[in-house]
Amino acid sequence: MATIRADEISNIIRERIEQYNREVKIVNTGTVLQVGDGIARIYGLDEVMAGELVEFEEGTIGIALNLESKNVGVVLMGDGLLIQEGSSVKATGRIAQIPVSEAYLGRVINALAKPIDGRGEISSSESRLIESPAPGIISRRSVYEPLQTGLIAIDAMIPIGRGQRELIIGDRQTGKTAVATDTILNQQGNNVICVYVAIGQKASSVAQVVNALQERGAMEYTIVVAEAADSPATLQYLAPYTGAALAEYFMYRERHTLIIYDDPSKQAQAYRQMSLLLRRPPGREAYPGDVFYLHSRLLERAAKLSSRLGEGSMTALPIVETQSGDVSAYIPTNVISITDGQIFLSADLFNAGIRPAINVGISVSRVGSAAQIKAMKQVAGKLKLELAQFAELEAFAQFSSDLDKATQNQLARGQRLRELLKQSQAKPLTVAEQILTIYTGTNGYLDSFEIAQVRKFLDELRDYVKTRKPQFEEIISSTKIFTEEAQALLKDAIQEQKELFLVQEKV
């Protein structure tokens, strides 16, 4: 018969007592009172945070937006068709965040950073909050480097700098998205990461943009965040913040980023829908009172960081659609007041064949020539002045038939300058090409040509300088100054090409 050893038993009991770890897991839960239209009202969830993610019994995730005394208003990140009254909900203890990494480059994702391009999962080891605070005053420095768009009208007269917020505004079908995509194409080789956020767009329009970027090799440095028109309002509301979080990831790693929001007015409409369903009081145009804050907290995240933080930058180009050119509507005025200037696209100019249809008279950049290299400043000043005088004269000339020779010459020069601002889509120009184009126009070298010949001559001149006078581009790119040597090279090239062109035209 085995003997019972009391000391061994007591040791085992003592060990077990020492190893015992009393773990109490408290889960913050609630019950669904009502669900429908992408909104759920929950009883319970007493300690939930504003903006916290909550998980429903069947797996749908929601965001707690309304914290009321008797219930919590939750917006659903999905259709929520399987959620039933009385089903349980638990708080996750997490605020909305997304995974971030270099692997996102070249991919098309949704507002939850999940790939929607059918090319498999995206690996990531880090995450960022979808809504993080904008850099403070000390964390920023003033904008001083240009972000070239490749469009003469913008780079010469409405320059955009790295870290600036510049609004692109105009009626539908005036080429707003084309200006933004051309800017992305022009960043090739400039070490700029681009993020294109499509909010409430047609899926076919987004596919068109993605194809255009892929064909020209721009997807290598671009991320597309897309929520189509049929997406839940919650995801359309979140998409811009997801794009901003991805751009911030690169900005804080000392990189330069460009983010395009197309368009924030659709985000405001999604937010209005959510707010009205949550029974928040409506204000002007039925938008909630904090719709200004919706956009300001998004656009303030664009910045040029200080030297201490590595001088990374995030440049934002929000695109807003107007109705019949009315910029005094609620959302356009809000975004105009937040941004550092606006590029106004006119339907009249577009229909008159002036493309890009930029109305230079009412477009403005509040950063100005600080966002231009010295060479561009040297030639752009004269262009601005001559176009302003031309616009004034043109209006006056409509009421007068007998104009003196000087006025006729000035009108002829203005028409040719307006012609040189025209550009084909997806054909951005380098800074050197822009400088030679502007110099040719403002110094009267185009005056002898017919208006119909101007663009053809300029195209051939740019090719001629690129092949026969490569030193010109080297001087501009290395010194950033339009030196006397560069000027002499350009004058020779213009004369030589002019002679060649006139001979060809006679044949």
Swiss-Prot record:
Q: Which family does it belong to?
A: Belongs to the ATPase alpha/beta chains family.
Against CDD domains, the record matches this protein to: ATP-synt_F1_alpha_C, ATP-synt_F1_alpha_N, F1-ATPase_alpha_CD
Q: What does this protein do?
A: Produces ATP from ADP in the presence of a proton gradient across the membrane. The alpha chain is a regulatory subunit.
Q: Which protein, by its recorded name, is this?
A: ATP synthase subunit alpha, chloroplastic
Q: Which HAMAP family does the record match to this protein?
A: ATP_synth_alpha_bact
Q: What NCBIfam families does this protein map onto? A: atpA, PRK13343.1
> Assembly and partners?
F-type ATPases have 2 components, CF(1) - the catalytic core - and CF(0) - the membrane proton channel. CF(1) has five subunits: alpha(3), beta(3), gamma(1), delta(1), epsilon(1). CF(0) has four main subunits: a, b, b' and c.
Which residues does the UniProt site feature Required for activity point to? S363
